[in-house]
Design a protein with these regions (language model features):
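Short beta-strand-centered segments that line the small-molecule binding cleft or hinge
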Residues: 4-5, 71, 90, 112-116, ...
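C-terminal effector-binding regulatory domain of bacterial HTH transcription factors
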Residues: 1-5, 120, 246-253, 264-316
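Beta-alpha-beta core module
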Residues: 156-163, 167, 229-277
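Short helix-boundary/capping micro-motifs
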Residues: 15-31
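A short LG(V/I)-centered, amphipathic sequence patch enriched
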Residues: 45-64
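Alpha-helical linker/hinge and terminal dimerization helices associated
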Residues: 47-48, 69-91
Length: 316
């Protein structure tokens, strides 16, 4: 006896016979002939090697083995119904996993989207990885995540990006610095100052150094810092100047000021990036659609640049 050869169709016929206690009614409901139903029950009994139903005076009675099989079938079909519901939720983005890797600065912004999304989709897991651009780029190249957040997306054939938020970079100085009181500040005024910068590989540092090089300037005095918070605190303590995303600055910190450097514009944007050569999870697709529809409700409207429709359309 090998029960592995029992088909779901055989079990479906058997369950209907048990429920209706009628061969003819089973045939009608399942669109079969009565001889076919009888044949299926006979085949099932031969496979189990036990009588499952008995006919007495044209009435069907269920044996002990038949009742035990019926209970087992209920459990099995119930589990498959649950699995079908699970698949529907998975395909609808209600379950599953959306792995996101983001550059350091984006951690100040993305939770404002992730929080409302998670409240609407509590069964979606949202594991996050945070690093500098070089680290997130390495993860992208290895295909370790579903969605990547860059301020400068990779220029690769299998990379598809959608811009969603402006990321203005600003110069900050101690509140009592000589330049703090100047209404006109230029690159020439600041290049001789000590600058507190993130490590090489940081997108902010890359953009700043590229702007300097294009103008023929080189910084002579720099101090490497491990985080944007460290730069902000160090600038406020008088250690030097810094270049950071405006989004990392708390609104009521009076230990530093922003310098309006006239002859340089360090404008950038944040992008959601996916790999087109990899399957994107249903949860990731759900999150990107949520972001497209809710950017202005979740983030500061003045910085929103919602270009996610093309990205989402390309994923359909």
């Amino acid at each position: 006896m090998d029960l592995k050869h029992i088909s779901f169709r055989l079990l479906e016929v058997f369950m209907c016979v048990v429920k209706t206690r009628s061969i003819s009614e089973t045939a009608r409901q399942l669109h079969l002939t009565q001889p076919t139903v009888s044949q299926q029950i006979k085949r099932l009994q031969e496979t189990v090697n036990e009588p499952l139903v008995m006919v007495n005076q044209q009435r069907i009675h269920i044996t002990e083995a038949g009742f035990a099989l019926f209970q087992t079938c209920q459990q099995v079909f119930g589990h498959f119904d649950d699995y079908q519901d699970y698949l529907a939720e998975l395909r609808g983005g209600e379950r599953g996993r959306c792995k996101i890797a983001m550059v350091n600065t984006a951690q100040y912004i993305l939770p404002k989207l992730l929080g409302p999304y998670s409240n609407l989709h509590p069964h979606v897991e949202l594991p996050l990885e945070i690093g500098n651009r070089a680290e997130v780029l390495a993860r992208f190249e290895r295909g370790e995540d579903d969605i990547y957040v860059f301020s400068h997306p990779p220029s690769l054939e299998h990379a598809k990006a959608g811009r969603f938020l402006q990321n203005p970079l600003v110069f900050i100085a101690p509140i009592n610095h000589l330049l703090a009181s100047k209404s006109h500040v230029t690159l020439h005024d600041i290049v001789s100052e000590r600058f507190l910068l993130r490590e090489p590989g940081s997108a902010t540092r890359m953009l700043f150094e590229s702007a300097l090089q294009s103008r023929g300037f080189v910084l002579s005095n720099t101090v490497q810092m491990a985080s944007n918070e460290a730069i902000r605190v160090a600038v406020g303590s008088g250690m030097g100047l810094g270049v950071v995303s405006r989004h990392v600055l708390p609104p009521h910190d009076t230990s530093f000021c922003m310098l309006d450097v006239e002859d340089v514009n360090l404008a950038s944007h944040w992008y959601f990036v996916v790999r087109t050569d990899r399957h994107l999870s249903h949860a990731a697709r759900s999150f990107l659609k949520f972001a497209q529809l809710n950017l202005e409700q979740c983030l500061d409207k003045q910085w929103v640049t919602n270009e996610l429709s093309q990205l989402n359309e390309s994923l359909n």
